[in-house]
Amino acid sequence: MIIATLAQKSAMASQYSDYGVSVTWWCVDEERTEAAASMNAVLRKAILDDETVNPVGDINTVITEEMLAKVTEINITTSMDATGLTLDGLDLCTNLTKLSINAWQVSLGDIDLSAFTKLTDVTMSPTAGYTSIQLPDGIKSFKSIIKYANHEPVGPTTLDLTQYTDLEYVSVMDSYGEPAALKSLNVSGLSKLALLYVGGTPEVNIANCPLLTTCIKNN
């Protein structure tokens, strides 16, 4: 990649073409239209820090439609400053296939991911929990790990995953030794579920899961 001005690109591009050399140009003075102004600041930073989406890093602070189309994964880790995290603007990432939220001392409310038709892998683990969650119909992997770390989680208190018939893997851990916020987990009737990890939840319904040969429950 060559970072240059439009004038420099105009003057030099033909030289590379003449020698059959493929070059990606980033023109610092090229006008770019912001397409994610309404997006939560934490999500924006995660996208701008993704080199596959924004290869020039801090040089660019604009998220364009073209960049949004390239976003297939968003990963918020506990090492990041996730203060003020919401999922506002996440719907702009229409090609999202994987979402991982591991945010320290963050709680989220009612989460609705049902419109994300390409999303198959979700980790929803803000350490202070979330109220409820709706997943996409095509979800295959779901992880939810809620930790007590000098704060009380807001939930969830129940998880009924029975409508998500493509689920193959579920990992739900809660509390790490404290009384669990999650009181019940229902995965009954999931014909594709093959692996289940559960921790801290007193009631788990695994009836009629024909492929489920491994269910690891830690109290």
Where are these regions (language model features)?
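N-terminal capping/linker segments that flank leucine-rich repeat
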Residues: 1-105, 110-146, 154, 160-169, ...
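Intrinsically disordered, low-complexity Ser/Thr- and acidic-rich flexible linkers and loops
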Residues: 148-153, 175-179
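Tandem repeat scaffolds
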Residues: 177, 195-196
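Active-site lining segments of carbohydrate-active enzymes
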Residues: 199
